[in-house]
Amino acid sequence: MKNILKYLFLIVAAACLSGSSGTICAANQQSSASGNTTEALASKPLANDNAFNTVAYRSLPALTVGGKEGVSAPFAGMSKGSLLVAGGCNFPGKPAAEGGEKVFYRDIYELENPTSDKSNWKKAGQLPEALAYGVAVTVPEGLVCIGGTNGKESSAKVFLLKKQKGGIKCVNLPALPQALDNMAGAIGGGYIYVAGGQTNGRSSRAAYRLSYPHATSWERLPDIPGAARLQPAAAVQNNGVTNCFYLMGGFQPADASHPGFANTDGLVFNPQTKQWSRVAEIIPHGTKTPMTLVGAAALTSGCAHIIFVGGVNRDIFQQAINRPLAIAQAENALLQHPDDSATKGQLETLRNQQAEYMLHPAPWYCFNDELLIYHTITDTWVTESRSPLLARAGAALVGHDGEWIVVGGESKPGVRSADVTAIKMTMRPSFGWGNWTVLIAYLVAMILLGYYFMKREGDADDFFKGGGRIPWWAAGISIYATMLSAITYMAYPAKAYATDWTYYPMLVTILLVSFPVIKYYLPFFRRLNVTSAYEYLERRFNATTRLIASALFIIFMVARMALVLYLPSLALTAVTGIDLYICIILMALVTIVYCTMGGVEAVVWGDVVQGIILVGGALFAVGYLVFGTEGGVSGFLQLGSDAGKFRLFDWSFDYRSATFWVIILGGMANNLISYTSDQTVIQRYLTTKDERSARQSIMLNGLMSVFISIAFFAIGAGLYTFFKTHPAELDYTMLKGDTIFPFFMMSQLPQGLAGLLIAAIFAATMSTISSNINSVATALSVDFYKRWRPQASSEQTLKVARRTCIVSGAIGMGIALLMATWEILSLLDFFQEILGLLSSGLGGLFLMGIFFPRIGGKAALTGFLSGVCVVFLVKNLTPTSFLLYGFIGLVTSVLVGLIFSYIFKEEKNLKGLCWKQLDADNAK
C-alpha cells in the first residue's frame, strides 16, 4: 500500500512539474509569441479596469546596493519628507543561479523629497546590524523597523529610525516577545500589528500588537488560524465599523511530512471581538483562478480598499517549493525499486527542472504585474492596471503624498531590481452639462420661491410664524424635511451599506415620541402663544434660564448648519471635482439668500417641494439598485441576507456600540430633545391655525419617519449588493464612506437623472439650513433683541431677523470650511455625538419645567449645567456610545434638578405652566 501511494505521488508530481517549458503563464505565452515581453505585458488591458480611476507610473532614481543590483526585503518608510530604505539583501558577487552567496546589509539610504525630479539617493547611516525580511511601518516620528534576519538567526529587535540633523538616529523600542522574520505587519487604529513568519527557520502562527507610542510591551493576540504563513501581506483598514488587521496570502513551507502550499485566502483580526475570521478567496471578480500574495506588499487606499503590489505566481511558486520533496520521494522510491524505469525518468525530469529553475528569463516566472485590490466592506477582489513595473516579489511599498512607492524587490528568483517606481491612482470626476442644468434650475426655483413669499410678508409675525396659514400636512412634511437633512439622505444609506439596519429602530422612536409630545408638550407651546420656545422657560423658571437655553440652542443650530452644509459640498466635490471650499461657499450663499427673503412661510413650502424630491429620489434609487444587482430582487435579498445587511437588532448588553437597548434609549432621548426643545421643530407647531392641526402635523411626521426611512436603509443594502456584484465599479480612492450614495448616482445614472438625485441632496440640505437660519433669527430676535428693546417695532424686529439670518449663515459657513479639514469617518455618528453633547440639557429643562413643579429656576439651572458637564466627562473618560449622550444628559439634569430643589426652594404661581396645573385647568 505504501508503494502504491508513492507511485501515485510521483504521477501527480510529474503532472504538476513536467517540462520546464510547460509551466508558463498566459502573459508569458503571449510575450513569447510577440517577442517583446515588456510591451505585451504593458499593453494587455484588464477586463476589470473601471472608468473612474486612472493609474499613472513614474520612475524615481534607481537604488543599487553592493554593486549593480537593488535589494529585496528591505525596511522602507518615510521620515520628515524623506524616503528611507534600510537593510535588505542581494547577491552582489556570483549570481544566485550559479551558487552565489546572499549578502545582508545594514546601510540606510535616503531620498529627500521623493516627489521631486531632482532628488538622488545618498547614504545616511547604518542599522545596528545587517537585517532583511522584517516589517517596517511609518509613524509620525519616522520609520519603525521590526524583527528580520541577518541570514543566520531571526531578530526580536524593534527600533525607530528618525531623520535629524547630521543623519539618522536609531531609537530602541519594546522588543518582540519572540524573534521573527518573513512575517507581515501594519499600523492603524493606534496599534502596530505583526503576524506570521518564522523563528530561526521554524514557522510561527503567533500574532502580536503594540499600542504605539504608549505601550512598553507587545500584546499577544490569538494565533492565526490554520497553517503558518510566511511572507504574507498585511494592512490595517476599516471594515465599515472599526479598523481591522488584514493578513493576506503567504505560504506554508514543505517539510518531510507534508507538501508546501501557497495560501489563496486571507484573514482579518477584529480588535473589537479579538477574533480572526477568513475573508473571500483571492479570486479577482470576473476570473476563476485563485491568486496568492506571497512576496507581495500592501497599503490602504481610501476608506475601505487595500492595494496589493507584486508577488509570485501561485502555481510556479508552489511547484518550486515542493520540487525538493518530490525529488526526495522519487529517490526513496528508486532505492526500493532500482530497476523501475518510470521512476528513473520522473527523477531525471524533476532534477532537470530543479537545475533549470533559476535560469529562465524573468517573464517565465509570471510575477504578478497587476494592482490587486481588496474591498473590506463587500469582501471582493478586483485587478486594475497592468504594468511590468509591478512584476516584483519582496519589494517594499511606501505611501507618500498620494503616491505608492515601490522599492526594489526581485524581478526573478535571485535577481534583484534596482527600480524605484511611484504609482498614483486618481479619480476622474465629471458632472456634465445635463446635471448642471437640472441642479441650477432647482436652485433658481428655490430662490424664486423665497422671493414670492417675501412679497407676501406683512410683519415679523409672518416672518416667524407664517401668520398661522400653514396647513397641517404641509407643516408635517416640513418637520420631516427639516429633521431629515442631507445627514439622513447620505449617512443612513452609507451606514446601512457599511453595517446593517440596526440604526433603523432609532427612526421608529420618532413615532413613539410623538405621543408624549402631543399630549404633554404641545399644549404649552400653543396655549401660551409663544413665538420662541424658550419664552416658556422664562415664565416657568426665570429669565436667566431662558437666555442660557436660547444661547445654547443658537450655538447648536450654527454647528448643525455647518455639518449639513459640509455634507452636500462633500458629495458634490466627490462627483464633480469642484473644490470643496468653493462648494461650501456657493451652497451657503444660495441658502442664505433663499431663507432670508421668504421667512418661515417660504421655508415650509420650500420644504414641501424638497420633501417630494427627496422621497421620489430615494424610491427611484431603491428600485435601480435592487434591479441592478445580479439576480434582481432575489439576488438583492439573498446577498443582503447572507451578509447580515437586514439585521435590525443587536441584543447584546454592550453600552459601547449600537445595540438594541442603546438605540432605543438613545433614540427616545435624542428625539424627545429635538421635538420638545428645538425651536426649528417647535416653530412648525406654531405655524398651523390651531392645536388640532399641529397634532396632525406631528403624527404625519412620525409616520413618514417610520415608513419612508425604510427606503434609506434599503438604499444602503442595495448599495452593498450592487457593488458586491459589480466591485470594479467602485472608486478605489474614495476617502469618505458617506459619499458612496452620491458616487453611485454619478457613476451609474444617466445625465440629468443623476443631477436630479444630487439636487435631492441639496434639497435635504436647504430644507434644514433654511429652517435652522430662520429659527436662529427667531430666537435671537425674540429672546434677546426684543428683551433689550421691548419697544422695537415689528419692522425693526424684522430687519434684525433678516440680518441675523445673514450673520448666522455666514458663521455656519465658516465652521463648515473648518470642518472640511477634520477626519470624520461617519458624519451620522458625528452629528449624533454633537446632538447629545450640546442639546441634552435643553431637553432636561423642558422636562423639569413641565413634569416637576417643585423644581425652581436655580435648581433647574444646576441640573442643566450638571447634565452638560456629565455628558462631556462621559465622552472623554468612558467608551460609552455617543448614542447615549442625550439619555445621560437628560436623566442627569432631572435627577440633579430634583435633588437641588430641596436646597433651592422657590415659591411661584405655576398656573398653566406645569402639566398637573394644565390638566387641572382643563378639568374645570
What function would you assign to each model-found segment?
Residues G19-N36:
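Signal peptide processing junction and immediate N-terminal pro/mature segment
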Residues M1-K6, R854:
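Positively charged n-region of N-terminal signal peptides that target proteins for export
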Residues A13, S32-F431:
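Kelch-like beta-propeller repeat domains
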Residues Y7-S20:
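Bacterial N-terminal signal peptides
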